[in-house]
Structures are given as C-alpha cells and as structure tokens.
Amino acid sequence: MSVTPAGLRIPPPERRAPIHDDPVAVHGRPPVMWLLAAHGRSGAGTLAQIWAPAGDARRGWPAADRHRNVVVVCRTDRAGLDAAHDLLLQAQAGLVGDCTLLGLVLVPDAPGPLPKTLRRWAEVVASAAPAVWRVPYVEDLRTHRQNELAIWTPTEPDPPPPGRMRAPAPSTTSPHHDLAAIGREIFTAARNASGH
C-alpha cells in the first residue's frame, strides 16, 4: 500500500491513466521501456516504433508486464502539458501499480521555441519528473508512416549528427541523431532501474 505525501495534489480518477491488470506485451520480446502517451497524438506511438527496446503502453501503466519502466510522453501544447502533469502527479502519489517512472519526454507541437507562458508551464511540469528528455522537431517525420521509419537499436552505433556539409539522413533510412541519443539515454535509465 502506498502512502501519498501530504499536500500532494492528486488528479481525479478520470484524469489518471489506468493500471493494466494484464500484460500489454503479448508477442515477441517484452519492451525494456514503456512509453505512456499522456494524450492522443502525443508522439508515443511514433517513438515506440523508432526505439526498438520501447513499447507503447496503450495509455495505461503496464503493471503486469515483466519490465515496468515508464516514460510519460506529451506534446508541448497546453493540453498535452496538462495531461502529462496529471500522470506525473499520479506517479508521485504511488498510484501506478509496481511501475517505475523514469521521466518525461517532451515532443514539440510546432517548430521553433515555445511561447513564454508554455515554456514556464513546461518547466513546472518537468519539475515533477525524475528526468526530462526534449525531442527536437523533426520535419521529416511528418511525411512518413510509422511503419516506414528506420528503427534504432542499442546494439548499433548512433547515426552521425548532421554537419555543415551533410544533411540529416531521411527518417526512413536512419533514425534522427537526436532521437537515437535520447533513446539510448532512456534505455540506459531503464536498464539501471531494472538492476542491469
């Protein structure tokens, strides 16, 4: 039984993610890290497609799975940040089964910097997470279906960053350098949380 810290604002049940009673992973190798979408179109499905050791948690906490390391994923618009904040508070209250919250992935909702008010709110939301990863805006991802995207695996070297004379490779032939680097950081955090 978890004890909720005094003064912690707990979101109402309708704003929490459910705790899955049955395993989410039913086929193949179980994911080492789960991506929990804070809302629809968060980018969790796309990132789960790109990062081989990740799985889409299907909008709930994978408490019945072998590995229970979770990253909340949200867009950086107001609704996305609000939804992520609710899930982070749910985790702080211990209402996530036996899952371990690794952190928060912020997916840009548009190119360019966040407006000041959103930037401030994103900082508040991020302060509720043990770690934060900021995904860059990758225009190329918009033009491809998920099943066309190149997959990053921890056993392969990360793709080189684009240089002055070298444009980034298309997302269908190689994962974006920053996405591979973030995937590796989360994978390492998941392995460390699992005691490997």
Where are these regions (language model features)?
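Extended, compositionally biased accessory segments flanking or bridging domains
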Residues: 1-65, 154, 159, 171-174, ...
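Inter-motif core of Ras-like GTPase G domains
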Residues: 59-76, 88-105
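Active-site-adjacent loop/helix micro-motif of nuclease/hydrolase catalytic cores
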Residues: 78-87, 113-118
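Cytoplasmic membrane-interface segments at the C-terminal ends of transmembrane helices
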Residues: 90-97, 123-128, 192-193
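Beta-strand-loop-alpha "switch" segments that mediate conformational coupling across diverse proteins
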Residues: 124-156
